[in-house]
From Swiss-Prot:
One of the record's GO molecular function terms: ornithine carbamoyltransferase activity
Family named by the database record: Belongs to the aspartate/ornithine carbamoyltransferase superfamily. OTCase family.
The entry's keywords: Amino-acid biosynthesis, Arginine biosynthesis, Cytoplasm, Transferase
HAMAP family from the UniProt entry: OTCase (MF_01109)
Associated pathway: Amino-acid biosynthesis; L-arginine biosynthesis; L-arginine from L-ornithine and carbamoyl phosphate: step 1/3
Function text: Reversibly catalyzes the transfer of the carbamoyl group from carbamoyl phosphate (CP) to the N(epsilon) atom of ornithine (ORN) to produce L-citrulline.
Organism, scientific name: Archaeoglobus fulgidus (strain ATCC 49558 / DSM 4304 / JCM 9628 / NBRC 100126 / VC-16)
Domain of life: Archaea
InterPro entries found in the cross-reference section: Asp/Orn_carbamoyltranf_P-bd, Asp/Orn_carbamoylTrfase, Asp/Orn_carbamoylTrfase_sf, Asp_carbamoyltransf_Asp/Orn-bd, Orn/put_carbamltrans, OTCase_ArgI
Xref: NCBIfam families: orni_carb_tr, PRK00779.1
Name of the protein this chain belongs to: Ornithine carbamoyltransferase
Amino acid sequence: MKHLLSMADLEKDELFEILKLAEKLKEERYKGVVTDYLKNKSLAMIFELPSTRTRVSFEVAMTDLGGHALYLGWDELQLGRGEPIKDTARVLSRYVHAVMMRVREHSTIEEFARYSTVPVINGLSNLEHPCQVIADLLTIYEYRGDFKDVTLAWVGDGNNVCNSMILAAALTGMKMVISTPENYDPNPEIVKKAEEMGAKLRFVRDPKEAVKEADVIYTDVWTSMGQEAEKEARLKAFQPYQVSDELLKFSKDDVVVMHCLPAHRGEEITDEVMEGKHSIVFDQAENRLHAQKAILLKLLGKESEVY
């Protein structure tokens, strides 16, 4: 694995190595172990879109690992004034040891990676969000102990996180039921690829049907960054897909609820569910830190130093 742009960049063994490594790093942090696995290493973080969790978790990850992270806003770089992506990629490759990017278009990060001589990490694009989903898998594993008997119901928009989770289902053997309104389905090319990889996917329009056998219910915002003009239409289309106490009545008693945050409480998820006994949302958010530490070590060839 040279870069992490998509969940499809991972082999099954690589994914499980990252999850195992993340568990170990989490344990070390809770014990207060001081590490310097990435001493004298620098990560450039390029943000075309704003972030709370991605920025903080990557910065803290590099600090915890003994390295350094540089925040680079899109408009602070010459990229914002028209410098070609390939030039920026070549230059930054001479300065830093890895680059994380949070961008509008997936094609941007693909082009950057083509010209970069250091690992490039997708911190979010319009197509995928692999860092989020690796953290999600760590969380599911902590709660369920395995993936083979887990059914995850995706309720809401077939967005970038959904796309990455579909590929993750293929890699882990987890079953996935996807419930979206018409015209808001996940990317068909990703669905096809996942099915070719052996993914066990089922598509249903009725969210009540989708959650019946679910061990995990996952939702995300109905209106993502850049879709503000569609907000009214989306609110109308997605209203039946709200994750509420009423919807949970149709699921298992021990179901857990996930959301990658930020949440629009009262839209895709109610306040009661966010704060309720089924929610593992904040454990999930914490795991961004541990998962991304593992991703960084794996890409920089330092994972063997942990054991």
